[in-house]
């Protein structure tokens, strides 16, 4: 039997019912099927400790912005419930449960709106863990409450069930049979069924014994026939119902098998052809090279190989329609997914999203398998390191241990992953312009440096394309800024998404500054990386950090400017505007 993804909802029109549901979420009232000793396992994923207050805050905001009162008898909030088959939760690893939580929250925010989802909590103190919370149905087009946008009609409700189940497919959770005659079950009724216990009918009376004038054998026979008739009237409908249930279960199992087979077939067929995406974007095959796609402005030169693409102009590639759109249009993940849904349909776009995740996972696995073992640079030739750094305008009193030299005399900036394990090195040639990664380096690791940062303190984070640029940034920070605590990070080339390491470091930062090159490629990547960080950390202060325009002409990155500042590189004179005389 397959394991199912469970999604339930309940509409609330009054403050009273919202508060009652909130008390259940926060365990403010007795919950029979909850274990008090496991209450500490519960977790707030979004919102405050008072979900009803989160709803009230959003409703007040809507009234203030629209200048109109809430409609009487209108739906003010939707209570959401996300669960799974008990069998799945019993076998799931902690990592799988974490993925389930993350994907569920992402799906809810993408489906109902990130700001509309005001509260979400994990209940782990019950037999089967589940998520519950509130969404306020604010229409993004009108700014007013409009639950019908998401919950109007059987088709819309079916789409919600299909959408949530699709997001759960990678975890092995499936949708129930589409078109089943089973009816929607309200959240409270779902809890009620969990808590329901068998109750005996107190009205059953024992038969009155016969009088002395009644033949006992005749009386017993009459009572037996009467009891048999009475029992049959109760048992026969139950037997018929049980038979129908068995037949329905067989039919459902057959339907699930057919659905599973159809999904397996669809997995090999339904990826959106990248050529169709490029055509929709207005690109055409180059007449001189039928393998390359070009746009009218000649910004892109793209070749495609099945599910993969490569842009020769930017020297960057990726996999799938979502990556392709993010690269060519500059949209973030959500924007690209919405674009695909508008033009190719919701189901197709959703499937491409799953393939995108699968593709990235396969790439990481293959890279890890094929990557040779990284050999740690053992040398620390300080004279050579100092000579190179001084030539770039950088000086240290003491060379950090994270800067070494390899067997070929290259300067190596050591890269660590999210577990502080050495996983690679960024290399710079001392006698040539060589730069790259050491053999076996992981793209999930980064070179980092810190100034006045303690383990438990916040810091300002500066992210650059190279270790040299990251260190150069310090030359443009005020003493007050440096004293407050600064962390530097290199992405070893442009990056438009978050690695585990980068996510961990960004999470602890009070502000993030993307200090990428100010050429076209660097700024396109900076814009995408800013968007990715804002999507992951909506309240985080993030900016694309650039020098004043008058300084940009002296180079294309922060080390160029540092070398100009240190007198190691000549300044570039600004272009003079020539005033022309107008002749009549």
Curated annotation (Swiss-Prot):
Q: Which UniProt keywords apply?
A: Plasmid
The source's superkingdom equals Bacteria
Pfam families in the record, alphabetically? DUF3991, Mob_Pre, Toprim_2
Ranges where the Toprim domain occurs: 459-548
Output the Gene Ontology terms for molecular function: DNA binding
User: A GO biological process this protein is involved in?
Assistant: DNA recombination
Signal peptide range equals none
SUPFAM superfamilies with a match to the protein in the record? Zinc beta-ribbon (SSF57783)
User: InterPro entries this protein is in?
Assistant: DUF3991, Mob_Pre, TOPRIM_dom
Please name the Gene3D superfamilies in this protein's record: 3.30.930.30, 3.40.1360.10
- Which PROSITE patterns does this chain map to? TOPRIM (PS50880)
The protein depicted here goes by the name 65 kDa protein
């Amino acid at each position: 039997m397959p394991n199912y993804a469970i999604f339930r909802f309940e509409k609330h029109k009054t403050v009273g019912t919202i508060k009652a549901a909130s008390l259940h979420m926060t365990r403010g009232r007795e919950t029979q099927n909850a274990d008090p000793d496991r209450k500490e396992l519960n977790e707030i994923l979004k919102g405050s400790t008072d979900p009803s207050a989160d709803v009230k805050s959003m409703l007040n905001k809507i009234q203030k912005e629209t200048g109109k009162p809430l409609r009487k008898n209108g739906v003010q909030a939707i209570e959401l419930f996300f669960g799974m088959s008990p069998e799945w939760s019993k076998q799931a690893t902690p990592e799988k449960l974490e993925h389930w939580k993350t994907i569920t929250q992402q799906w809810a925010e993408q489906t109902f709106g990130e700001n509309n989802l005001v509260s979400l909590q994990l209940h782990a103190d019950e037999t089967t863990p589940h998520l519950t919370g509130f969404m306020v149905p604010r229409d993004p087009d009108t700014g007013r409450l409009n639950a019908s946008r998401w919950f109007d009609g059987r088709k819309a409700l079916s789409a919600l069930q299909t959408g949530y189940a699709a997001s759960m497919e990678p975890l092995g959770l499936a949708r129930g049979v589409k078109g089943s005659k089973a009816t929607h079950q309200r959240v409270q009724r779902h809890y009620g069924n969990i808590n329901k216990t068998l109750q005996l009918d107190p009205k059953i009376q024992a038969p009155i014994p016969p009088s002395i004038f009644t033949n006992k054998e005749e009386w017993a026979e009459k009572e037996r026939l009467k009891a048999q008739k009475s029992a049959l009237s109760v048992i026969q409908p139950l037997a018929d119902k049980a038979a129908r249930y068995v037949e329905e279960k067989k039919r459902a199992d057959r339907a699930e098998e057919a659905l599973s087979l159809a999904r397996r077939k669809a997995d090999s067929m339904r990826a959106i052809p990248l050529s169709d995406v490029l055509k929709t974007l207005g690109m055409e095959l180059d007449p001189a090279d039928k393998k390359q796609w070009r746009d009218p402005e000649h910004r892109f030169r793209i070749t495609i190989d099945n599910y993969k693409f490569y842009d020769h102009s930017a020297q960057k590639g990726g996999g799938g329609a979502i990556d392709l759109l993010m690269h060519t249009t500059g949209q973030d993940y959500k924007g690209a997914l919405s674009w695909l849904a508008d033009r190719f349909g919701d189901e197709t776009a959703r499937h491409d999203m799953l393939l995108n995740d699968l593709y990235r996972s396969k790439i990481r696995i293959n890279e890890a398998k094929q990557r040779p073992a990284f050999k740690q640079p053992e040398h620390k030739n300080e004279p050579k390191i100092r000579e190179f750094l001084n030539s770039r305008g950088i000086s240290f009193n003491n060379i950090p241990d994270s800067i070494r030299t390899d067997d070929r005399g290259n300067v190596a900036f050591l890269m660590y992953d999210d577990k502080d394990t050495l996983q690679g090195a960024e290399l710079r040639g001392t006698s040539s312009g060589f730069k790259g990664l050491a053999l076996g380096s992981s793209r999930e690791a980064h070179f980092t440096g810190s100034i006045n940062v303690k383990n438990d303190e916040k810091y300002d984070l500066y992210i650059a394309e190279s270790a040299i640029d990251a260190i150069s940034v310090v030359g443009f920070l005020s003493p007050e800024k440096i004293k407050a605590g600064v962390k530097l990070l290199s992405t070893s080339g442009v990056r438009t998404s978050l690695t585990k390491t980068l996510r961990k470091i960004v999470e602890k930062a009070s502000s993030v500054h993307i200090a990428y090159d100010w050429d076209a490629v660097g700024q396109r990547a900076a814009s995408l990386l800013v968007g990715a960080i804002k999507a992951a950390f909506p309240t985080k202060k993030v900016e694309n950090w650039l020098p004043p325009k008058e300084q940009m002409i002296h180079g294309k990155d922060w080390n160029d400017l540092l070398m100009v500042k240190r007198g190691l590189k000549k300044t570039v004179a600004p272009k003079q505007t020539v005033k022309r005389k107008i002749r009549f």
